[in-house]
């Protein structure tokens, strides 16, 4: 079954196909689709910024549509990034600008690479707010940072050697290892004694705090309410 999180209709079709299949209940759901500023620009057919819809809104619809099919003690992981809190030398004044400005950015914001950082912040807001709203204390919902990985297709093959060198030289603490991060992600899904909920795991099975901005409950609620208004016709 195919799914494209940059299309709400595609997400709806996937959910319909899954419900009509014989797969049954879902134990684990990993929301890993994503593009960066290097590969994503413009609007989707739904009229939203392509990074916002691919990285956040499509997952928002997917998770909420599949919640009734989740095992009671299942696990959901939203793949975010430590770039939800960009380095100060990258942007010293990174503040929440409002969900609508991210979903339908003006000309200046539509060209900004900060759209990726904001989308990863949205992943964390979604994680925290989802836990508050579902009321299922057995369903474990967490966020994960795999680290910077130029060997993946996050940038659509458009990342340059110069950019890779820049990250390694200026942000070495943010570089990830594909094998190690993949294993950590698998462990977070399969570990039998795992009990953590609402945490952010950084390239391992050890959780760390997210940015101060990410704990703003007002922002998280605003994002949820607006996202719900955008996807309500696709359930």
Where are these regions (language model features)?
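Rossmann-fold NAD(P)H-dependent dehydrogenase/reductase core
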Residues: 1-153, 233-235
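C-terminal helical subdomain
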Residues: 167-208, 217-219
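Hydrophobic "lid"/C-terminal helical patch
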Residues: 185, 189, 223, 227, ...
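Aromatic-acidic/polar surface patches that form glycan- and anion
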Residues: 52-55, 115-120, 173-178, 216, ...
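Alpha-helical membrane-targeting segments
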Residues: 107-109, 148-150, 155-177
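C-terminal/domain-terminus segments
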Residues: 143-149, 200-212
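Surface-exposed beta-strand-to-loop junctions
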Residues: 42-43, 105-106, 162-164, 203-207
